[in-house]
UniProtKB/Swiss-Prot annotation:
Record's protein name: Large ribosomal subunit protein uL18
Cross-referenced SUPFAM superfamilies: Translational machinery components
Record's keyword annotation contains Phosphoprotein: no
Subunit note: Part of the 50S ribosomal subunit; part of the 5S rRNA/L5/L18/L25 subcomplex. Contacts the 5S and 23S rRNAs.
Keyword RNA-binding (UniProt): yes
This protein's GO CC annotations: cytosolic large ribosomal subunit
Organism expressing this protein natively: Roseobacter denitrificans (strain ATCC 33942 / OCh 114) (Erythrobacter sp. (strain OCh 114))
HAMAP family cross-referenced by the UniProt entry: Ribosomal_uL18_B
Gene: rplR
Keyword list, A-Z: Ribonucleoprotein, Ribosomal protein, RNA-binding, rRNA-binding
Family: Belongs to the universal ribosomal protein uL18 family.
Pfam families cross-referenced by the UniProt entry: Ribosomal_L18p (PF00861)
Length: 119
């Protein structure tokens, strides 16, 4: 029986995350989630099991509420880079999950790099 799109997405997400964990043990993870309406990003310390910082298009401070485009993704990336500095994080590895590194996901990564976060 053929796998559904959702099942393939979950397999891809787990495959990507497991490969990243093997290589980047002990480092902070920059995790991206993209939905049809919003983008959210978290800095996660997997060793402690805590979220150090987060940013989303749902936040009114960013001025992009309800927008899901590349410009909004870039603002979220810049915001997470700024919050990472406040949390004392200068380096993280990028976890794209099951999403392709293209468009909005790529815009988040590039804006975070421009903001001073080493990815």
């Amino acid at each position: 029986m053929a796998n559904s799109k959702r099942q393939l997405f979950i397999k891809r997400r787990l495959r990507v995350r497991n490969k990243l964990r093997k290589v980047n043990a002990g480092r902070v993870r920059l995790s991206v989630h993209r939905s049809n309406k919003n983008i959210s990003v978290q800095l996660i310390d997997d060793v402690a099991g805590k979220t150090l910082a987060s940013a989303s298009t749902l936040e009114k401070d960013l001025g992009v509420v309800g927008k899901n485009n590349i410009e909004a993704a870039a603002k979220v990336g810049a915001a997470i880079a700024e919050r990472a500095k406040k949390a004392g994080v200068s380096e993280a590895y990028f976890d794209r999950g099951g999403f392709l590194f293209h468009g909005k996901v790529k815009a988040v990564a590039e804006a975070a790099r421009e903001g001073g976060l080493k990815i």
